[in-house]
From Swiss-Prot:
InterPro entries with a match to the protein in the record: DM7
Family: Belongs to the DM7 family.
Region entry Disordered, spans: 415-443
Keyword Nuclease: no
Biased composition (Basic and acidic residues): 415-430
Alphabetically ordered keywords of this record: Repeat
Protein's recorded name: DM7 family protein GG19680
Keyword Repeat tagged: yes
Length: 543
């Protein structure tokens, strides 16, 4: 009988072994084979006093020695367990494959703090001894032990997932009566059914295990179907921390600007939960199908007495990571716009589609994403300059055809003012001839430079300012069908001229968003809203 959880230990973390009344020799203690291959490294196993006896000679010999230790997770013990009473053992007395571990002697842990699933229902007397150990990252067991574990098979213990079970109803007070939700007309009890997900292609990189935490619990229920015998206005369902894990993006959506539809919970059924135990309403896109609003109670927020009174014998079991606390609960309001549909038929269709996709894709070793055959645009703008050396940030170019091949779509030329001399109309012809000669000479002295898409816009704008009057036009309008060239050039000109103002507006929008996020975070955590006395903003670097 054991439970496992994730954990680690800092190198060199030791503690002095003091005089103790219980120090067994556990080198021959063997765990299930799946534990040695699991990403969870901490195990809590029950010991038996008649089998794992106290080694008095070893306790006297190792008294005062430095023994490896680690932080024992409090989430594996219900209530307030005296974790400081653990006795960490020397490495030679630990089971094979463990780098640190300790024991709680018989009667050290109160019965209310002893793991629920590790004691028999009819156990009497003092609490049995308990072993808490941290496995090494890589364990190589002897071949004899591996063959023994293969013959024994997997232990029918709670390995990675546990099924939360209610205690017997005789623990209720005699004057209290169970008010099960199945007997009410305004609420219904549902069972959360997770649609089968399509198989994911194997990845060469191992996935990092995310530790289970219950400070906040916001699952994504968009792929969950609620199966209910009767359709009522509100429905209640027990969720699974294994099948419906916490999703950080959903938590950010609830604390951001996204709308979370709310409704009033029946006060005669649900207690008033405040602070971290309050129900969290989810955005509409993360709700199950057919629901217009819904909220989630995180694990441990509702008492076990409430589950026994209102869920009773009708509560469907769901796998949980930790059975020491009550499971999460979903309360949803059914949408009146969506018509009732056959859930079983929908489940069969989804399951059939998942099976067909699994048969077609499950045998593939790896799925490489298709690369679209889209040419990468490198160039952006071609500019005529009077100097052979290209401007800062630009590159030399031979012709407009070469610029078009690089992806350039805009060309910039130096504008020339046309001065009309009305006082000397007889000299128009000679003046036009002189201008033609100057223009031809200037054309011979002009050079082409091009800028990339990711070039510095300030350098491009400064070069255009040095040109004086600059005129922008499209290199080839026929290559851009359906594009309003005049509108594009107008917007580009505004970007060049008002770029500083645009940056200031974007910076202000970012600061406003940060202010709203900090304010909503403080409201969610019930913290007083304080502004910085220097900059007038919410928590900043001056705090």
């Amino acid at each position: 009988m054991l439970q496992i959880a994730s954990g680690n230990r800092e190198e060199g973390q030791v503690v002095e072994l003091k005089k103790t009344k219980y120090l067994p020799y556990l080198f021959n203690l063997v765990m299930p084979k799946s534990f040695y291959h699991s990403h969870n490294r901490i195990v809590v196993a029950r010991l038996y006093s008649n089998v794992h006896k106290h080694d008095k000679q070893a306790a006297e010999f190792f008294e005062g020695f430095q023994t490896p230790c680690f932080e024992v997770p409090a989430s594996m013990f219900p209530g307030e367990a005296p974790l400081n009473k653990i006795v960490f053992m020397p490495p030679v007395m630990l089971p094979m494959g463990f780098e640190a571990g300790g024991v709680f002697g018989p009667g050290v842990l109160p019965r209310r703090s002893y793991p629920i699933d590790l004691t028999a229902s009819g156990h009497k007397g003092q609490s049995p001894p308990l072993f808490v150990g941290l496995r090494r990252l890589y364990v190589q067991l002897p071949s004899e032990i591996e063959s023994f574990l293969d013959k024994m098979g997997e232990f029918p213990a709670t390995q990675d997932t546990l099924v939360y079970g209610m205690r017997r109803s005789n623990q209720l007070l005699k004057e209290e009566q169970a008010q099960e939700l199945m007997l009410r007309n305004d609420l219904s009890l549902s069972m959360a059914y997770n649609l089968p997900a399509p198989p994911t292609p194997p990845s060469p990189y191992p996935y990092r295990h995310v530790p289970v935490q219950y400070n906040i619990y916001t699952p994504d229920l968009s792929n969950v179907l609620m199966m209910m015998p009767h359709q009522r206005k509100l429905t209640v369902a027990i969720l699974s921390t294994v099948n419906n894990p916490h999703v950080p993006s959903v938590a950010l959506a609830t604390m951001g600007d996204e709308e979370c539809p709310k409704f009033e919970l029946p006060s005669d059924v649900f207690p008033i939960c405040e602070g971290v135990n309050r129900p969290i309403f989810l955005p509409r896109r993360f709700l199950p199908k057919g629901f217009e609003s819904g909220c989630v109670f995180k694990p441990g927020s509702l008492s076990e007495l409430w589950f026994m009174g209102y869920m009773g014998r009708f509560s469907p079991p769901q796998p949980q990571h930790n059975c020491a606390i009550t499971p999460p609960l979903f309360v949803g309001k059914i949408s009146r716009v969506v018509l009732a549909f056959d859930l079983m038929k929908n489940i069969q269709m989804e399951y059939g589609a998942a099976q067909s996709s699994a048969q077609s894709e499950g045998s593939l070793n790896a799925v490489e994403p298709k690369k679209p055959n889209v040419p990468i645009t490198k160039g952006f703008l071609v500019m005529e300059t009077e100097h052979p050396t290209p401007p800062s940030g630009g590159y030399s170019l031979q012709s407009y055809q070469e610029g078009s091949a690089k992806g350039c779509v805009v060309k910039v030329e130096k504008g020339e003012t046309q001065e009309m001399d009305e006082a000397h109309p007889t000299k128009e012809e000679s003046k036009s001839e002189e201008e033609g000669e100057v223009q031809s000479g200037s054309q011979e002295e002009k050079y082409l430079s091009w800028f990339k898409v990711d070039s510095d816009i300030d350098l491009i704008a400064e070069t255009m300012v040095d040109m004086g009057t600059a005129q922008m036009s499209l290199i080839d309008e026929e290559a851009l069908p359906g594009v309003d060239g005049a509108c594009v050039l107008n917007q580009l000109r505004e970007v060049f001229e008002d770029r500083n103002e645009i940056r200031q507006n974007i910076d202000q929008l970012i600061h406003d968003h940060i202010y709203r996020m900090n304010r909503d975070r403080m409201l969610a955590l019930r913290l007083p809203i304080r502004t910085c006395f220097r900059c007038g903003l919410l928590p900043c670097r001056h705090f």
